């Protein structure tokens, strides 16, 4: 219970890693719902919880753009006019579902993390191979899914060993 000057507010903290935990929210109505990493949350949970709240706030890391959370929620939001230029045009083009009035989309990139010193930021960037899915998602902040080769630096001549070469070992 959070006590304000005028009234008490009840705060529920629920996990969504399994249905038994989040089903505790059923039957309730909530003023504000916060879902961290909505892109990995169970979609049944997201749908059920979202319909029970007045205000939904969610975070996510870029993921497979074909996940239902994008078509049902994220791509129905729009950036505020004064922040449109902050987002990559690639992502703005994906906000293609009919807009929901009042649904706002905010874009934050790796550069917005004020807790990182320039040195720490560079250390993290240098530890992620450029051209990989994780670089695109985590460093550039763009959506994407793994397709084709898992490692873009894969070289068949260098990384594939023939049976004959194995026998020689």
Segments predicted by a language model, with ranges:
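ATPase catalytic-site recognition across NTP-hydrolyzing enzymes
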Residues: 113-169
């Amino acid at each position: 219970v959070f006590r304000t000057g005028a009234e008490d507010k009840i705060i529920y903290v629920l996990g969504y890693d399994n249905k038994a935990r989040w089903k505790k929210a059923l039957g309730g109505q909530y003023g504000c719902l916060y879902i961290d990493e909505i892109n990995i949350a169970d979609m049944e949970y997201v749908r059920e919880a979202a319909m029970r709240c007045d205000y939904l706030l969610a975070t996510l890391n870029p993921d497979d753009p074909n996940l239902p959370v994008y078509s049902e929620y994220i791509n129905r939001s729009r950036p505020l006019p004064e922040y449109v230029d902050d987002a990559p045009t690639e992502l703005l083009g994906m906000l293609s579902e009919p807009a929901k009035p009042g649904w706002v989309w905010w874009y934050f990139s790796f550069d917005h993390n004020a807790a990182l010193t320039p040195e720490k930021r560079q250390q993290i960037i240098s530890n992620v191979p450029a051209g990989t899915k994780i670089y695109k998602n985590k460093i550039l902040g763009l959506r994407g899914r793994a397709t084709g080769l898992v490692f873009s630096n894969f070289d068949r001549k260098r990384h594939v060993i023939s049976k004959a070469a194995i026998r020689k070992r």
